[in-house]
Amino acid sequence: MQAARMAASLGRQLLRLGGGSSRLTALLGQPRPGPARRPYAGGAAQLALDKSDSHPSDALTRKKPAKAESKSFAVGMFKGQLTTDQVFPYPSVLNEEQTQFLKELVEPVSRFFEEVNDPAKNDALEMVEETTWQGLKELGAFGLQVPSELGGVGLCNTQYARLVEIVGMHDLGVGITLGAHQSIGFKGILLFGTKAQKEKYLPKLASGETVAAFCLTEPSSGSDAASIRTSAVPSPCGKYYTLNGSKLWISNGGLADIFTVFAKTPVTDPATGAVKEKITAFVVERGFGGITHGPPEKKMGIKASNTAEVFFDGVRVPSENVLGEVGSGFKVAMHILNNGRFGMAAALAGTMRGIIAKAVDHATNRTQFGEKIHNFGLIQEKLARMVMLQYVTESMAYMVSANMDQGATDFQIEAAISKIFGSEAAWKVTDECIQIMGGMGFMKEPGVERVLRDLRIFRIFEGTNDILRLFVALQGCMDKGKELSGLGSALKNPFGNAGLLLGEAGKQLRRRAGLGSGLSLSGLVHPELSRSGELAVRALEQFATVVEAKLIKHKKGIVNEQFLLQRLADGAIDLYAMVVVLSRASRSLSEGHPTAQHEKMLCDTWCIEAAARIREGMAALQSDPWQQELYRNFKSISKALVERGGVVTSNPLGF
């Protein structure tokens, strides 16, 4: 019973996590489309200006219109729908001036990381070297998405992704320092801040004069963010809150001057008068007093970044430093994290690009058995798989960033997928690079072992991949569940809902019979990719059939079916990856890019294997008795390990 209650609680939090409910759909609004006011104004930067005169609660409290049909491909695929608005054609969002401005930034940033920054030295020092730190300030790297009017560079999400990719290619430790500062550290001020908060904090944060940190995780609160214990008690006069508690593993924790802190506060329900504890976000200055930090943590990787525990002891926080609405901190935190995940995928695409270059260089120059090793099939397959993973990750990153720049508000599943896929792909690519390089890859000098150490954390922070898989599956199933509920209601009045019933029921029956639902990507994918397009449609139908069957079987109880949800998420990730590369490769073929035929091969190869994985995975889920036995075995084996305190079986020798 306890496990069931825990699972149900986790499920409710996961469904809140991404904004699938109407409460979160309009939470903070993504950048609104419209003419650019500056050649490099857009995305979060322009949004910060657009909302400067608004009360921070506007996005949380304004009257929400009836929810429109989602344009998210990921939401649609759970329903067996081809929702292509956000994926075809592959989006191109930068105007000529924005493109030119970005090009002018790429060259100096690349040169800086090639000639000035020393990732090995940063790793050895376990800090960002002072020369690099000052150089980053001069480049404006601490305020890439802060509007120029507030001292930043004013980049949109797509421009930001391109520069983050360069950082990820060279030094993930520096990348974490910068990302913890602006991707999550002060992102809440950028998105939720009042005009006064923005004007007070953003200029110094953008220049690097002050550093920001995001304080959510606690010793007893990791993936379960709602269980935080840090408290903020309002004063009787209402002018300030007294903050007490601690936050664990905070990136920039020992460096930061400004903290985005999440704490429990008493909130009175206006309807009932009952007082409940809810999470509230605060902007907290180290200068308020009562803030200390522990020593830098000794870590496996990203050693150049500062990670420390932060303590708050009787910190007086002015009431005007509430970020967003009192009691809306969980939404603020989740929106900040959702908003920044595309940047992680972009950075890791850059990491893979650099690692693949090292692997190719070694394979091209290393001779064994009288042959360059790049001529051997085993090496060829490794290199091909490595570059496919990079291509998919990069395609996802720029797809999501472009969707955000175009004003999409429903991208949470796609952003989560990009984080899951990118972090796992980068690990695989780097591991294979070491394998190709052999003993040399294991040595410190080439720097690949450092990258592998740095990469391990990416599957853990900003939402563990395990939790995000549950989120992807549950969020998608929630939307499909609403549709099934609608069909159930329609059946009570069949004559008044004949069109709906005939359309949806017909598609469902055709899918179940294996006849196909008439969906097609014809006219969207390039003719040379038509076979791969057909594979994607077939995979979508297979996936949607299983989603529907499992929802009908488990109903709301599906939140407890983590074995199933994980496998549905894997299918969703593969399916989204197929569509993204189909879109990107189609654009390259249509525009006659020099690499178009190479991209076609990457796309076709990916789709062939992904379709096979989806087909096999969904077939296994449909073999219900076998799957249930498998799940029971997992539970029993795990229970035995827990009861024994480790491995149950004895050594084969008996002692």
Curated annotation (Swiss-Prot):
FAD binds at residues 214-223, 249-251, 464-466, 562. Homodimer. Homodimerizes after import into the mitochondrion. Predominantly expressed in heart and skeletal muscle (at protein level). Also detected in kidney and liver (at protein level). Pfam families: ACAD9-ACADV_C (PF21343), Acyl-CoA_dh_1 (PF00441), Acyl-CoA_dh_M (PF02770), Acyl-CoA_dh_N (PF02771). Changing R615Q: In ACADVLD; likely benign. Its EC number is 1.3.8.9. Residues 1-40 form a transit peptide. It is a peripheral membrane protein. The modification Phosphoserine is found at S517, S522. One of its GO terms (biological process) is fatty acid beta-oxidation using acyl-CoA dehydrogenase. Its cofactor is FAD. It comes from the Eukaryota. The keyword Transit peptide applies. The gene is ACADVL. It comes from Homo sapiens. Residues 483-516 are annotated as: Membrane-anchoring. The active site is at E462. Residues 41-482 are annotated as: Catalytic. It catalyses: a very-long-chain 2,3-saturated fatty acyl-CoA + oxidized [electron-transfer flavoprotein] + H(+) = a very-long-chain (2E)-enoyl-CoA + reduced [electron-transfer flavoprotein]; decanoyl-CoA + oxidized [electron-transfer flavoprotein] + H(+) = (2E)-decenoyl-CoA + reduced [electron-transfer flavoprotein]; dodecanoyl-CoA + oxidized [electron-transfer flavoprotein] + H(+) = (2E)-dodecenoyl-CoA + reduced [electron-transfer flavoprotein]; tetradecanoyl-CoA + oxidized [electron-transfer flavoprotein] + H(+) = (2E)-tetradecenoyl-CoA + reduced [electron-transfer flavoprotein]. Changing R469W: In ACADVLD; likely pathogenic. Pathway: Lipid metabolism; mitochondrial fatty acid beta-oxidation. The modification S-nitrosocysteine is found at C237. Changing K382Q: In ACADVLD; likely pathogenic. This is Very long-chain specific acyl-CoA dehydrogenase, mitochondrial. The modification N6-acetyllysine is found at K51, K71, K239, K276, K278, K298, K331, K482, K550, K556.
